[in-house]
Design a protein with these regions (language model features):
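Short glycine-enriched loops at secondary-structure junctions
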Residues: 69-74, 94-97, 123
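Catalytic core of membrane glycerolipid acyltransferases/transacylases, capturing the structured
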Residues: 74-91
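Active-site alpha/beta core segments
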Residues: 61-66, 72-78
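Positively charged n-region of N-terminal signal peptides that target proteins for export
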Residues: 1-5
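Bacterial N-terminal signal peptides
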Residues: 6-16
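Divalent-metal-activated hydrolytic enzyme cores
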Residues: 20-62, 85-86, 95-113, 130-221
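Glycine- and Gly-Pro-enriched alpha-helical subdomains that act as flexible
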Residues: 119-134
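Structural recognition of the beta-strand scaffold that forms the well-ordered cores
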Residues: 66-69, 89-92, 119-121
Length: 221
């Protein structure tokens, strides 16, 4: 019991301390947009990657944004947004499919570490989304990922154009809506205006991140 109380006290103190250093979600979004612009132009400045930064972070972390992204090795989040050590709290799974462990990680970064911007980041030519569209035979637990993405594949099956890329965007939009409604932490923080959750798609062939419009995301509910 004593250990539990100590842990709870530590978390609360951490929360209070970090609240003073929180970055407004709009400011955080601007940082990401500007960082990706540098990266896609080949003008990355690679901030916060010095030995001094390593030592500084040994005392704690204060990321300014949370990225919920795909595990694809071609989309390293810190690099495509031109950020450094301790800047981003990243949760990655194939197809950026979220479940209880992911939700707990996101809530921890939001409520305890103070990151008030959450970006759901998909990408073009996503293998997990392609599998949900084409429904091939897959091994083991891969089917759980495909099943989670199938609603996006079904919602876009009659659209003209590239069906996989349409499903990629729809999958991101549906995941944004899911997180916005996630109780009790995120839904309240979003409703109060403290937290912003947005969706984006990284384009493998250009290095550019496209942020989805709010109209598109709301239409996917």
């Amino acid at each position: 019991m004593k250990h539990c109380l100590t842990l709870i006290s530590s978390i609360l103190l951490c929360s209070v301390y970090l609240a003073h250093g929180q970055v407004h979600p709009d400011t955080a979004l601007t940082r990401l947009v500007e960082g990706n612009a540098r990266f896609s132009k080949g003008e990355s400045i690679r901030p916060n990657q010095s030995p001094n930064r390593v030592k500084e972070l040994a005392g704690g972390q204060n990321p300014f944004a949370i990225i919920v992204g795909c595990s694809d090795s071609r989309v390293p989040n810190e690099i495509v947004f031109d950020q450094g050590l301790g800047d981003l709290f990243i949760v990655r799974t194939a197809g950026q499919v979220s479940s209880y462990a992911s939700w707990g990680s996101i809530e921890f970064a939001n409520a305890v570490l103070g990151a008030k911007l959450i970006v759901v980041l998909g990408h073009t030519e996503c293998g997990a989304v392609a599998a949900a569209v084409n429904v091939p035979e897959v091994p083991g637990h891969v089917v759980t990922l495909i099943n989670a993405i199938k609603p996006a594949a079904q919602a876009t099956k009659n659209l003209q154009g590239n069906r996989i890329e349409s499903a990629v965007k729809m999958n991101v939009a549906m995941q944004v809506n899911q997180l916005r409604q996630l109780e009790p932490v995120l839904s309240k923080s979003v409703a109060s205006g403290q937290t912003k959750i947005v969706g984006a798609v990284y384009h493998l062939r250009t290095g550019k991140v496209e942020f989805l419009s709010e109209e598109y995301i709301l239409a996917a509910r």
